[in-house]
Design a protein with these regions (language model features):
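Flexible, acidic/Gly-rich N-terminal and inter-domain linker regions that tether
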Residues: 1-105
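Alpha-helix boundary/capping detector
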Residues: 43, 47, 60-61, 86, ...
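Conserved Radical SAM active-site core
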Residues: 92-212, 222-223
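Helical hairpin unit composed of two closely spaced alpha helices linked by a short loop
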Residues: 221-229
């Protein structure tokens, strides 16, 4: 299918979107509308962009796709938490969890499909690493939960499958997309990254200008035990 080779429109920068709007013969203000639909309202199709002319939406659909994940499995627990298995267009699947409580919605996302860290107690590491996720694929997990529950996400924890600091640059990009006032606008302190302890990237994370939250999974305070785990 031809659509497999088309780029995901959400990977374009605001400048690139403006260029596309201009090339398709649309007035400049359409770029702002497009930005709002893509990154503030987080739509997953061109049909949802109701204030754009139908002909323009059809033009966009000829040039771009939404490479959003498909929900393969959803488990709902008694407390309302939902666990999803989400599959990306290339067939790679990851787990995501939505945890609603009064006036709040926390989401736990994966940063890699599989993991190379080899922690003894962790099921994810048994199969090794398939691939790292892109920042957009991390954000897509958050958007999926938000749309499924019909609620705004108030916090995100990077504690699903994978080691975020083994995919550092994309993790930081995802944090900034989630934090952006032109995106999901989640406060930096409500975005938490959990690492099993990749020291150079802990330092790099601490040097970021934003006040993102760090959680370190020590497994044990005793170094010899920790080495075994």
């Amino acid at each position: 299918e031809r659509t497999h080779h088309l780029p995901d429109i959400r990977t374009l920068s605001p400048k690139e979107l403006s260029q596309v709007v201009s090339e398709l013969g649309q007035p400049a203000f359409r770029a702002k509308q497009l930005n709002e639909w893509l990154f503030e309202k987080n739509v997953c199709s061109f049909e949802e962009m109701t204030n754009l002319p139908k002909a323009f939406r059809e033009q966009l659909a000829e040039h771009f796709v939404f490479a959003v994940p498909t929900e393969v499995v959803k488990q709902v627990s008694k407390d309302g938490s939902r666990k999803y298995l989400l599959q990306f267009p290339d067939g790679v699947a990851v787990e995501t969890v939505g945890m609603p409580s009064r006036n709040r919605l926390a989401v736990c996302i994966s940063t890699q499909a599989g993991c190379n860290m080899g922690c003894a107690f962790c099921a994810t590491g048994l199969a090794g690493l398939t691939r790292s996720l892109t920042a957009q694929e991390m954000v897509d997990q958050v958007v999926h939960v938000s749309r499924d529950l019909g609620e705004r996400v108030t916090s995100v924890v990077f504690m699903g499958q994978g080691e975020p600091f083994a995919n550092f640059n994309e993790t930081v990009r995802a944090l900034r997309m989630l934090n952006s006032e032109h995106g999901l606008n989640i406060g930096a302190r409500h975005l938490t990254v959990s690492t099993c302890g990749i020291i150079p990237n802990i330092r790099a994370f601490a040097d970021l200008p934003e006040q993102f939250t760090l959680a370190v999974s020590l497994h044990s305070a005793i170094q010899s035990t920790r080495n075994q785990l």
